[in-house]
Amino acid sequence: MSWIILVIAGLLEVVWAVGLKYTHGFSRLTPSVITVTAMIVSMALLAWAMKSLPVGTAYAVWTGIGAVGAAITGIVLLGESANPMRLASLALIVLGIIGLKLSTH
């Protein structure tokens, strides 16, 4: 259950990371409320997952999901670069997340 909660927390990190772009420095109300809410819920779920997962593993997986998710969102929705080096780097992050999951009992 902790891993599911951690994945949800990571996905919410993507929401708030991408949401920051749409807040325009927190000058737009709706995107700002959505972004701050996603931040709070993401952090709360991360803390909950850390009750039974190693801190380093949980934090690395959370940030990894956020980084990969934000980059993929940027590529797919925002027209950001999808060059081979960037995609290979994202794949390495995903492999690292899988490795951390497999090495945690």
Swiss-Prot record:
Gene Ontology BP terms: monoatomic ion transport; transmembrane transport; xenobiotic detoxification by transmembrane export across the plasma membrane
Periplasmic side: 50-57, 103-105
InterPro entries: Small_drug/metabolite_transptr (IPR000390), Small_multidrug_res (IPR045324)
Induction record: Transcriptionally regulated by guanidine, via a guanidine-sensing riboswitch.
An example Gene Ontology molecular-function term: antiporter activity
Primary localisation category: membrane
Keywords per UniProt: Cell inner membrane, Cell membrane, Ion transport, Membrane, Transmembrane, Transmembrane helix, Transport
Transmembrane segments: 1-21, 29-49, 58-78, 82-102
Membrane disposition: Multi-pass membrane protein
Keyword Manganese: no
Xref: Gene3D superfamilies: 1.10.3730.20
Subcellular location: Cell inner membrane
Cytoplasmic side: 22-28, 79-81
Gene Ontology cellular component terms for the protein in this record: plasma membrane
Stated role: Guanidinium ion exporter. Couples guanidinium export to the proton motive force, exchanging one guanidinium ion for two protons. Overexpression leads to resistance to a subset of toxic quaternary ammonium compounds such as cetylpyridinium, cetyldimethylethyl ammonium and cetrimide cations.
Family: Belongs to the drug/metabolite transporter (DMT) superfamily. Small multidrug resistance (SMR) (TC 2.A.7.1) family. Gdx/SugE subfamily.
Record's subunit section: Homodimer. The subunits assemble with antiparallel topology.
UniProt name for this protein: Guanidinium exporter
Biological source species: Escherichia coli (strain K12)
Organism taxonomic ancestry: Bacteria, Pseudomonadati, Pseudomonadota, Gammaproteobacteria, Enterobacterales
Gene transcribed to yield this protein: gdx
